[in-house]
């Protein structure tokens, strides 16, 4: 009877694997920008300029501010169909917003408060229209006004971000030279308003033939960027403004050739090389894709291809992910906006920093599709909370980390110096973040020299009956949600006793701050 009872108890305990961590604390293997985790707004938001006014909602401002500092890229497919018209009247919503910005906040708020409520009720229909247009691959020109630029710049700067604005590259003269006349008008207005903006030209030129029937080679695109650099130098404000490009898509054979040709003719005109990456097609993606080591590892191959081209043409140029997410085509419904998407997002952040990518721009902070950080009602999704923890805990210096285990691809670990701006931590502390892609609990054993150190655990688990397909997440057992429209919750750690193993449940991820680690690389 006793033997039977012991057998039952053993079977009731979840299976567990133990892996030893190998951590390099003596010197960093690289460093990333303080704006490493940055955001995007898809330019399709301006298809109906009324909805740009949503950016003044206090809740969206609070959520964005939590992820600062960073860059906010306004770009995407619609970039190459935006026409600036400085003479077009603002929409009613934009006029109310301008009134709000010009007056005392308390005085103007009652009139402005009507705007977001009305727009939020209309947004779901607009989102469907945008997704339908994207799937039909039918694109038409959209006019943007001075008010649209005003709102974008105000949202970015007031939230702690630098706006990166994508100019239309499909405006062409005979002979396929870029027609910069509309860009001159836009630059002139922004300079007049003293808007501190960085710039791009075009979006995924490797797909221009599909989108518009026009094919432009990399050499010509390089000349276009040189021309844009000359235009910027005509404005004292933009003489040293940052210019990024070429914003190519996945580095397949044709795209690699396009990028290589561009770098030879225009690589010296840009400050950083930008490219885009998605793991899978949103229409056909499965839950298994989000948990597959093979799918996650494919990102490393793409990085290798892009870095190789850059080093062979303009050595030393920084490389950015100018747009990225889990699945292209607006994301994978019921997957890209759930807890399971965090495996792709956290692994991408870790691998990008380890392989030398300087900035990663997440598509999108808010907008149409399933891959956003904030839903249509401004409720933060699991990837938002994951991003918030990353911003709070992870510093810019990258350290080496690995696991000693037969299948080392399923527990995936990354190590950085802890964010020095965090009030609880000090120089020499390190932050480990880890993913468990297996269906059993993974125990991570720290190296012996760290057994005496205290560890703060920040374990993220799905909340509710939907398990890893949940749109809610809990931190150390507490549901994460905003306190009110202007207040993010406190992110409470769970202190682990010195010598504890780091227990990572099946299909989960989390952060571990090793206090008083005295890592030489972080001092």
Swiss-Prot record:
UniProt keyword list: Cell adhesion, Disulfide bond, Glycoprotein, Hydrolase, Secreted, Signal
Cellular component, GO, one term: extracellular matrix
Post-translational modification comment from the UniProt entry: N-glycosylated. Proteolytically cleaved to produce a 60 kDa and a 45 kDa product.
Glycosylation sites: 141, 196, 436, 439
Similarity comment text for this entry: Belongs to the glycosyl hydrolase 79 family.
UniProt subunit comment: Heterodimer; the active enzyme is a heterodimer of the 60 kDa and 45 kDa proteolytic products.
UniProt-recorded name of the protein: Heparanase
Top-level taxonomy: Eukaryota, Metazoa, Chordata, Craniata, Vertebrata
Gene of this entry: HPSE
């Amino acid at each position: 009877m006793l033997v039977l009872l012991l057998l039952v108890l053993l079977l009731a305990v979840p299976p567990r694997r133990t892996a030893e961590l190998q951590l390099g604390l003596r010197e960093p293997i690289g460093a990333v920008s303080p704006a490493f985790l940055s955001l995007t707004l898809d330019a399709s938001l301006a298809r109906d300029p009324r909805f740009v006014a949503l950016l003044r909602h206090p809740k969206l401002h609070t959520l964005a501010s939590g992820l600062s500092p960073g860059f906010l890229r306004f770009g995407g497919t619609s970039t190459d169909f935006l026409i600036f018209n400085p003479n077009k009247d603002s929409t009613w919503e934009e006029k109310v917003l301008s009134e709000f910005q010009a007056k005392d906040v308390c005085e103007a708020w009652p009139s402005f408060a009507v705007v977001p409520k009305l727009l939020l009720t209309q947004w779901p229909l607009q989102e469907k229209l945008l997704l339908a247009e994207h799937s039909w691959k039918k694109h038409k020109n959209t006019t943007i006004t001075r008010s649209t630029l005003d709102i974008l710049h105000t949202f970015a700067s007031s939230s702690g971000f630098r706006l990166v604005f994508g100019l239309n590259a499909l405006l062409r003269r005979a002979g396929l030279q870029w027609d910069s006349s509309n860009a001159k008008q836009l630059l002139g207005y922004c300079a007049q308003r003293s808007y501190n903006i960085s710039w791009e030209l075009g979006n995924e030129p490797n797909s221009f033939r599909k989108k518009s029937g026009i094919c432009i080679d990399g050499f010509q695109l390089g000349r276009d960027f040189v021309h844009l650099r000359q235009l910027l130098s005509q404005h004292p404000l933009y003489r040293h403004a940052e210019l990024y490009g070429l914003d190519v898509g996945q580095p397949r054979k044709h795209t690699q050739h396009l990028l290589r040709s561009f770098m030879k003719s225009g690589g010296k005109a840009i400050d950083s090389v930008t490219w885009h990456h998605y793991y899978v097609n949103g229409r056909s993606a499965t839950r298994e894709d989000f948990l597959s080591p093979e799918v996650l590892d494919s990102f490393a191959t793409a990085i290798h291809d892009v870095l190789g081209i850059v080093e062979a043409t303009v050595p030393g140029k920084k490389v950015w992910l100018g747009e990225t997410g889990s699945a292209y085509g607006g994301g994978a419904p019921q997957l890209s906006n759930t807890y399971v998407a965090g495996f792709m997002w956290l692994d991408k952040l870790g691998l990008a920093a380890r392989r030398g990518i300087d900035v990663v721009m997440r598509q999108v902070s808010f907008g149409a599709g399933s891959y956003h950080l904030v839903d249509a009602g401004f409720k933060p999704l699991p990837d938002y909370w994951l991003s918030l923890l990353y911003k709070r805990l992870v510093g810019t210096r990258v350290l080496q980390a690995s696991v000693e285990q037969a299948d080392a691809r399923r527990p995936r670990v990354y190590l950085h110096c802890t964010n020095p701006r965090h009030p609880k931590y000090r120089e020499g502390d390190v932050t480990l973040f880890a993913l468990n892609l297996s269906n059993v609990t993974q125990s991570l054993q720290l190296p012996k020299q760290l057994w005496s150190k205290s560890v703060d655990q920040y374990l993220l688990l799905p909340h509710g009956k939907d398990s890893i397909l949940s749109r809610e997440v809990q931190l150390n057992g507490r549901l994460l949600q905003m306190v009110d429209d202007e207040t993010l919750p406190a992110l409470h750690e769970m202190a682990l006793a010195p010598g504890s193993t780091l227990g990572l449940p099946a299909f989960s991820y989390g952060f571990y701050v090793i206090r008083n680690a005295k890592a030489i690389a972080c001092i």
